[in-house]
Amino acid sequence: SGCCSNPACRVNNPNIC
């Protein structure tokens, strides 16, 4: 769950994943 499992969020926040 969270940003890292959300593709749209993940591409905008690569540093936290």
From Swiss-Prot:
Signal peptide: none annotated. The keyword Disulfide bond applies. Expressed by the venom duct. PROSITE patterns: ALPHA_CONOTOXIN. Residues 5-7 are annotated as: Ser-Xaa-Pro motif, crucial for potent interaction with nAChR. Amidation at Cys-17 plays a critical role, since a C-terminally carboxylated analog is 3-fold less potent at the alpha-7/CHRNA7 nAChR subtype and 3-fold more potent at the alpha-3-beta-2/CHRNA3-CHRNB2 subtype. The keyword Disulfide bond applies. InterPro entries: Conotoxin_a-typ, Conotoxin_a-typ_CS. Keywords: Acetylcholine receptor inhibiting toxin, Amidation, Disulfide bond, Neurotoxin, Postsynaptic neurotoxin, Secreted, Toxin. GO terms for molecular function: acetylcholine receptor inhibitor activity; toxin activity. Belongs to the conotoxin A superfamily. Negative results: shows a weak inhibition of alpha-3-beta-4/CHRNA3-CHRNB4 nAChR and does not inhibit alpha-9-alpha-10/CHRNA9-CHRNA10, alpha-4-beta-2/CHRNA4-CHRNB2 and alpha-4-beta-4/CHRNA4-CHRNB4 nAChR. This is Alpha-conotoxin LsIA.
